[in-house]
Design a protein with these regions (language model features):
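Active-site beta-loop-alpha junctions enriched in small/polar residues
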Residues: 17-19, 44-46, 86-90, 116-120, ...
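Glycine-rich, positively charged N-terminal anion/phosphate-binding segment
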Residues: 1-37
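Core AdoMet radical
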Residues: 17, 44, 54-60, 113
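Glycine-rich tight-turn/loop motif centered on a GG-T
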Residues: 48-65, 95-96, 124-138, 193
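Alpha/beta catalytic cores of nucleotide-metabolism and tRNA/nucleoside-modifying enzymes
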Residues: 68-71, 76-78, 89-91, 95-112, ...
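Non-cysteine beta-strand/loop elements that form the S-adenosyl-L-methionine
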Residues: 37-47, 108-119, 176-181
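N-terminal small/glycine-rich loop or linker at the start of catalytic domains
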Residues: 1-13, 45, 50-53, 78-89, ...
Length: 204
């Protein structure tokens, strides 16, 4: 069963991909029944296969649809619903258009935005290239937090050390670590002590 997980993995989020509000609603009910702690909507993946299914980063061009999907999810489940996106796609303006996207989407009731601090190019770059070639723009994510202080803004993209994470936390509410966590998980052994002064044991 692909949705099985060990009790020790809590808190655990599940990421959903899609643009059909009803289908997403049905998936969210299953996720809550299976005891996930959070539902995250994928509005950041640029792969051609994902685009062909009308979800992922291409949805940044349809903020009203993203809003409607999230609104239905939030009304359906009791667990938190969040969204993960880029700072823009293709020729979108990183300043004006990102603010517009967040302004529309937050009307769904979604309070947490996880922002990959790169643009996504929907044509001409592979998913791997989209994680590396578009330049990181952390300052843009910081400005987004300044513009929307009532929202929880979590930064993502190219963050490799706990020192980096602590620096980002001076400007945003949270940090998401991706590739570096699975490529080299061992530095995370001491992360609880660095951030909370607690020592928690894990078995790898």
């Amino acid at each position: 069963d692909l949705l099985n997980f060990h009790e020790s993995e809590h808190p655990l989020a599940i990421q959903l991909g899609g643009s059909d509000p009803v289908a997403l609603q049905e998936a969210s009910v299953i996720a809550e029944e299976r005891d996930f702690d959070e539902i995250n909507l994928n509005v950041g993946c640029p792969s051609p296969r994902v685009q062909s299914g009308s979800f992922g980063a291409v949805l940044m061009k349809q903020p009203e649809l993203v809003r409607d999907c999230l609104e239905l999810l939030i009304k359906t489940v009791k667990i938190p619903v969040t969204v993960k996106c880029r700072i823009g796609v293709d020729e979108m303006d990183e300043d004006k258009d990102l603010d517009k996207f967040v302004q529309i989407v937050k009307d769904s009731g979604c309070k947490t935005f996880i922002i990959h601090a790169r643009k996504a190019w929907l044509k001409g770059l592979s998913p791997k290239d989209n994680r590396e070639i578009p330049p990181l723009n952390y300052e843009r994510v910081y400005r987004l937090k300044d513009s929307f202080p009532d929202l929880e803004v979590i930064i993502n993209g190219g963050i490799e050390t706990t020192h980096d994470a602590l620096e980002h936390l001076k400007r945003v509410d949270g940090v998401m670590v991706g590739r570096s966590a699975y490529a080299n998980p061992y530095p995370l052994v001491n992360v609880d002590k660095k951030f909370t002064d607690e020592v928690i044991g894990y078995q790898l």
